[in-house]
């Protein structure tokens, strides 16, 4: 199994270590020099040379949207995990063909959020005010 981690900060490096411990062949995209042998300076170069089973976007939050759009424009259609927060500002993005795109948000298991989900499940949400 092959995975690509985009971004090699603390969270990206943590993903790399966990995946390596699971026996996954891991590649990284980073603009900085990294200690990882299988490293690329751009998403397009990484995708040109490899077919990945899944990709983790762990870059700076303000780059998540452009990284996702680049992956989609290059035709990548396998699983993508995007670290939270999803984007740094509201963005228009088509919801077509997004069943393989996931957000790393572990609070979804919090009992408060589980209760909220059960309350609004099946309801049509018209707006959210926070």
Give names to the regions the model predicted.
Residues 26-28, 77-83, 102:
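Short hydrophobic/aromatic-enriched beta-strand-loop microsegments
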Residues 1-37, 54:
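N-terminal Rossmann-like dinucleotide-binding module
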Residues 62, 86-130:
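A contiguous active-site-proximal alpha/beta segment in oxidoreductase catalytic domains
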Residues 1, 24, 37, 78, ...:
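A structural micro-motif
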